[in-house]
């Protein structure tokens, strides 16, 4: 099968692909609609694509806590403001955690005041123990299911991506989203082109098409994940959505925000081994 372009998802995967010489440099002369991508998002991508040679921002967002105000009121528990609130024993059986090694460890590392990209074994051991200690409180480790469970009122709170939070609020008005005060992961998904792509110029044409303001708007309205396209945001007619603090938070108002970076093979192995200990404990 011939692959012309890919959206590898996680920003740190792009860094890994760059380091392994798997990506083609993009000819930005073929992508005039790149001008609609906000400068701040191009700066964000430099954390994994330092010279902006290999990627074009597609979607972005944060990881935070989605909570059901009605259920929390019934439990007599205040709205969460920090990651440490996910260790509140009053919430036993009401917490949904992401079934993802990087996201789960990010929560614990941030709770403890450490970097989401830490490879310090002492810090990771502390985070691992925190996750083990949290397990009796967890209803389930989930990925996509967090959306449906929260919409259905099956849990009081869960760790979720901001784009999913926007969708859930459309379905259940009792749901609110917060970026914890300790900081979080700010992620950005980007388009890249494999080095051996047989139709690189067509791939660039497609990326340029996806950077058109009207196209980016339709994409955002359909999938509810935030667009880095300034022209698309200007075209949003729903004022509540256009000014949504979930979709378009003012990142300057938060501290401790980080994109994930590639940890190297040793770092990946360390995280994966510790995650297995958490899940099997």
Could you tell me what each predicted segment is?
Residues 2, 7-154:
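Extracytoplasmic ligand-binding site segments that recognize negatively charged/polar headgroups
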Residues 12-16, 151, 157-174:
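A ligand-binding cleft/hinge motif common to bilobed small-molecule-binding domains
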Residues 17-25, 50-52, 167-179, 241-245:
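Ligand-binding "clamshell"
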Residues 66-71, 110-111, 187-199, 210, ...:
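A bilobed periplasmic-binding-protein/Venus flytrap-type ligand-binding module shared by bacterial periplasmic
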Residues 124-133, 171-195:
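Periplasmic-binding protein-like
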Residues 194-255:
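Mature extracytoplasmic/periplasmic domains
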Residues 251-281:
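Conserved C-terminal helix/tail region of periplasmic/extracytoplasmic solute-binding proteins
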